[in-house]
């Protein structure tokens, strides 16, 4: 079981984030990641710091040497897929081939609307996500891309240089479209704040989707993000679903349940 730290670049100064990243890099963690929001979540105040995801991940890549660095997840609707493909490759080269790029459809309506993106219905957001995934995957293979699609118009775009060790992750808890997209595109599948039972169900759905398209399910890595309330006086009924609570043995037992359903990595979030 691989252990990581998933620290959103919010409610902290950059110096505090850098200290956390340094701990992850020097203490044997496998993974350190950021996320991609304009506002902190939950939105307690618009004045609280919340750093932009691509820039934050670039800093994370540049100042670490050992951990894989990631974002869970970049919102596909915030950036043209050509730009996100180029950003991912740049971060991958900054890190020496340690970068993982997660992509999702977005969900936080307030930040969409207040930053001028609108907020399309869920089905439309997933359609845009799928088209973006198609283009990013193709751009990372070096051939010129011609695409006159529903959402994006690329005319001979080429992504150079090529990735060194860049991996594509799909993040989410949906039961239908998300597993299908993971089977089709992903090197890894991440689920935030889920129970072992739900994680196991979603992994089975990814496996069935792989079987339908003839893909080897074992190629796909997996992880969950878990809240951290160990030895806390926070009442269990208000702790987030998918959290480590109680003492050391309770946490070990919970991690074991995720391992038993096939999860390969735990990110403390």
Residue ranges and their predicted role:
Residues 1-269:
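Active-site-adjacent structural elements that line small-molecule/cofactor binding pockets in enzymes
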